[in-house]
Amino acid sequence: YFKYDLKLPIWEQLQAVRPKIKDLVALCAEIGIQPMFQNHSGQDYFGAAVWDIFSIMREYPAAQFSFAFDILHATCEGGKSWPLEFNLVKDHIGAAYFKDFKWEGRKLVTVPLGEGQVDPKYGEMLMKTGYSGPISLHVEYLGGDPKDPTVLKGFREAHLRDMKTLRSWLRRA
């Protein structure tokens, strides 16, 4: 991740990232992999607002540089405006991340898919674009030692439950 220094002008910092991205895209092409950028929430994260990284990303074909679009972070940052960010970048989504959260005071707390702030319409909107790339279901809310058989059983149940929710969101299209 790149981070902004909030004591310095944002636009100049954005322009300073441009050549770094250019070098990264060139290196990835040379070794045969596709770079992706995950949007991440936070007051100083480059890409948190989506438009900033997209102002650079749009200079490249999606096959050369794309988003790992994270709906949790887009919702956290954009609230109800996440559809604007989605529509801005939808042709450059290389991977779609699904996870959910709720607010506890000012703190973001991850929760099972469908139990928080993330709008199920994201799945529908994604599928209506004709998207056929990777979908990543995150279960960051799980805790415990995965070596413990009891905990592992709970992990499996959580994955199955969240996968059922995800399938229902994707079928809405």
Question: What kind of region is each of these model predictions?
Answer:
Residues V50-F69, T75-A173:
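Histidine-acidic metal/acid-base catalytic patches
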Residues Y1-F67, C76, R156:
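Active-site acidic/histidine proton-transfer and metal-coordination neighborhood
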